[in-house]
Amino acid sequence: NEIPQSNGMVRVGMQTEDVLKEIESFDVVGISSIFTAQTRVVEELVTSINKHYPEKLIILGGVNARSQLERFFNAGADLICLSEAELTIVEIGKVLRSGSRDFSSISGLAGKDGFINKQLSVLQNLDELPIPAWEMQPLKKYWEIARPHGSGFSEEEVAYASVMFSRGCPFKCHYCHISQEIENSTFGNVGALRLKSEERILKEINILKEIGVKYVFIEDDSLLAKKKRAKSIFNRLIEMNLELADVNGINLAHLCTKVKGKFGIDEELLELMSAAGFKKLTFPVESGSQRIIDKYATGKLDLIKHDVSALIKKAKSLNMEVAGNYTFGYPDESFFEMISTFKLARKHMAD
């Protein structure tokens, strides 16, 4: 189903009445709310679940959910996870199995009763996490919708899945929640860069192949933060014969080189990524103003030294689609700086 929404978005997939039927036999309902655009739909869903099944425990997670605690609690949510929730949800399960509904001692959790418990620590060794049970998900239904990351594909069906090779990011851009994820914060230092081992990554990819996945979306916030490691992984992915997409944005400085003081693009790395199966790349240019990049985007890109146009042209020559991320509307951003961003985006569209 595709239902147009009042805000211009389109809701795809199960509608609220379908969800109510699906969850009828369950005691606990978990809902992710990561992005602002999901707020209204999630709020309506929580309200409806609470109305029809007031006895069910409703748990929310995600950056958007935790940033609007009062709103979602008023809608009917019981608990909201404040940080990475793989371990938190286990603790919630233990409480439920004990016959209690007192969750006030669990770290990284907020409750409608008013408690907000800071995240005491985050998992450092990602290999300790169990491998996602992809085979238990109704993947075929998602493949038939063919709308990964909200974008339509020309194919009638896309056999895809999402993975993460790492978590966190070494940069602290102001517009990203990671800039607030620091040691001793309420949410814990989930912004710290943590890496899965190569063997763990290959194990996950092999499992995805076994269940029929052909297109893998890599969700890392900083895929190339460790270039030597990334190249080693890409070399091992070549034989997998999969199509890959980096969707959250590759730091463009990582796609450039500096030899004898002269900057250039890392053609070898782009060619390796193409050989590994990359078909889509997202370039986070962020702004046409160097001042804005320096102030709000950790100075991660130098518009003069890093030749974005050359990167785009090289990627396209390797038959990779390129998308760009651009931001504007900062409190002290001038009209001229906004226009410079629009002009730069138009230039890149023509490259």
Which residues make up each language-model segment?
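Short strand->helix junction
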Residues: 35, 223, 330-331
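Radical SAM [4Fe-4S] cluster-binding motif and immediate context
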Residues: 132-322, 343
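Structural beta-sheet core signal
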Residues: 31, 60, 246, 324-326
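Short N-terminal helix/helix-N-cap motif within the alpha/beta-hydrolase-1
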Residues: 39-40, 69, 227-228, 335-336
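Catalytic cores of alpha/beta
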Residues: 69-74, 331-346
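Short acidic/polar active-site loop segments enriched in Thr and Asp
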Residues: 27, 78, 214-216, 279, ...
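Conserved beta-strand->loop/alpha-helix structural units within folded catalytic cores of enzymes
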Residues: 320-327, 348-350
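Acidic, low-complexity intrinsically disordered segments
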Residues: 1-202
